Amino acid sequence: MNTPDPWSSPEVQFCFAAANSSCPRKARPALVVCAMYLIMIGAIVMTMLGNMAVIISIAHFKQLHSPTNFLILSMATTDFLLSCVVMPFSMIRSIESCWYFGDLFCKVHSCCDIMLCTTSIFHLCFISVDRHYAVCDPLHYVTQITTRVVGVFLLISWSVPIFFAFGLVFSELNLIGAEDFVAAIDCTGLCVLIFNKLWGVLASFIAFFLPGTVMVGIYIHIFTVAQKHARQIGTGPRTKQALSESKMKATSKKESKATKTLSIVMGVFVLCWLPFFVLTITDPFIDFTTPEDLYNVFLWLGYFNSTFNPIIYGMFYPWFRKALRMIVTGTIFRSDSSTSSLHPAHP
């Protein structure tokens, strides 16, 4: 007697077997399904724990209560919410190719997806503004980047994506002109976010290309200024103080670390999000023929940016490494732990 291979593709199945209008469920070998669940659950857990560590560190330790760190705290909160509210449901949809949670929650999930991803990108943009003042105008940094200014940054970072996401999805402006395609694929268990040609371009511009261009421009300027400062130090007056060997080594190390950090920041950001937003623009122009699996790969690549954020903007800071050790070892539960000295106080 032949026994079915548990690792082979199953027969054609439907999301809701009892529904006549059910969407077909994508057939995948069980081994592939297991691998996808392991990878995506791992990404969700890493995103959740990494950003939770940043949130606890900044919220608990008083020495970290600075305007700059409030930006990082807010971004970590955004990425944490993404891992809790959006990614688990996207995981099931991506693997099972079915939506089991109803039409209303489909819209809410789509809104939260757009909102939180855009909010995270906006935070990255404003953090680049903060770093610009810190590196390019350090003498006036404290007076320029105040708690009030950061409050404005946070207000923009949250309010614009909220109004944009919920307004667009519930008004269905993104579907105008794509009604025939929507009707053709409509079935029970479907939850896809479709953009027409106009909103494919506008949404990508608002959520990625505008803040991304600002961010790239700022970091290029920061890099240029940092290199200029390094050359000025190297060609300055040959005084005993200016030519201090220890100072020159420290400066060289600092500039090298800054260059490395900026390269990683920009590389990860562009690598994670550029493919998805290019696809968002091009898909309506090729009659929505992008393969579903390719769309999911690019979507999750974008999600991974929220996984990497606490590593880039947290673990590169010595205060975070020390705070993380205190969290892991339980030292944080001491009554006086909130006043512990974490050096340096500012990133």
From Swiss-Prot:
- Pfam families to which the protein is assigned, alphabetical: 7tm_1
GO BP annotation list: behavioral fear response; chemosensory behavior; sensory perception of chemical stimulus
What glycosylation sites does the entry record?
A: N20
Renumbered to this chain, region (Extracellular Loop 2 (ECL2)) spans 175-188
Q: What is the effect of changing C23S?
A: Decreased trace-amine receptor activity
Extracellular topological domain residue ranges: 1-37, 91-110, 171-197, 282-296
For the null mutant, the annotation states: Mice lacking Taar4 show an absence of aversion to low concentrations of volatile amines and to the odor of predator urine. They display decreased sensitivity to 2-phenylethylamine.
The record's GO molecular-function terms, alphabetically, read: 2-phenylethylamine receptor activity; G protein-coupled amine receptor activity; trace-amine receptor activity
Q: Which UniProt keywords apply?
A: Behavior, Cell membrane, Disulfide bond, G-protein coupled receptor, Glycoprotein, Membrane, Receptor, Transducer, Transmembrane, Transmembrane helix
The record describes its membrane topology as: Multi-pass membrane protein
Cellular localization per UniProt: Cell membrane
Intrachain disulfide bonds: C23-C187, C106-C191
On tissue specificity, the annotation reads: Specifically expressed in neurons of the olfactory epithelium, to discrete glomeruli predominantly localized to a confined bulb region. Present in the dorsal area of the main olfactory epithelium.
Q: Name one GO cellular component term.
A: plasma membrane
Q: What is the effect of changing W273A?
A: Abolished trace-amine receptor activity
The main location class comes to membrane
- Give the CDD domains listed for this entry: 7tmA_TAAR2_3_4
The UniProt transmembrane annotation reads 38-58, 70-90, 111-129, 150-170, 198-218, 261-281, 297-317
Q: Which residues lie on this side of the membrane: Cytoplasmic?
A: 59-69, 130-149, 219-260, 318-347
PANTHER family registered for this protein in UniProt? HISTAMINE RECEPTOR-RELATED G-PROTEIN COUPLED RECEPTOR, TRACE AMINE-ASSOCIATED RECEPTOR 4
Its annotated function is as follows: Olfactory receptor specific for 2-phenylethylamine, a trace amine present at high concentration in the urine of carnivore species, playing a key role in fear and avoidance responses. 2-phenylethylamine acts as a kairomone in the chemical detection of carnivore odor and triggers fear in mice. This receptor is probably mediated by the G(s)-class of G-proteins which activate adenylate cyclase.
By sequence similarity, the record places it as follows: Belongs to the G-protein coupled receptor 1 family.
In Swiss-Prot or TrEMBL terms, this protein is called: Trace amine-associated receptor 4
Q: Which organism is it from?
A: Mus musculus (Mouse)
Gene of origin?
Taar4
